[in-house]
């Protein structure tokens, strides 16, 4: 598999208006998803995990009860790539947020 090409957080955010640039100067995008309850949040994470494995691209995330905080960047490219955009779009699509 070829190394993904870095596009940068700013370019990604132009196409993902509900996401934000990660803090700390890192080239990454982030978003907090909120759900009805823990079961809904965990169901979201399960669906994302399956898609992430298919893409061989995995999110950084943190879950407490109904909240899932996600940060996306491609470690091999040291920044945001089309893989991050694909996974972010999938998350938006299935989240209902």
Swiss-Prot record:
Catalytic activity: (4aS,6R)-4a-hydroxy-L-erythro-5,6,7,8-tetrahydrobiopterin = (6R)-L-erythro-6,7-dihydrobiopterin + H2O
CDD domains: PCD_DCoH_subfamily_b (cd00914)
Domain of life: Bacteria
Gene3D superfamilies xref list: Transcriptional coactivator/pterin dehydratase
One GO term of the biological process aspect: tetrahydrobiopterin biosynthetic process
A GO term for molecular function: 4-alpha-hydroxytetrahydrobiopterin dehydratase activity
EC number: 4.2.1.96
Protein name: Putative pterin-4-alpha-carbinolamine dehydratase
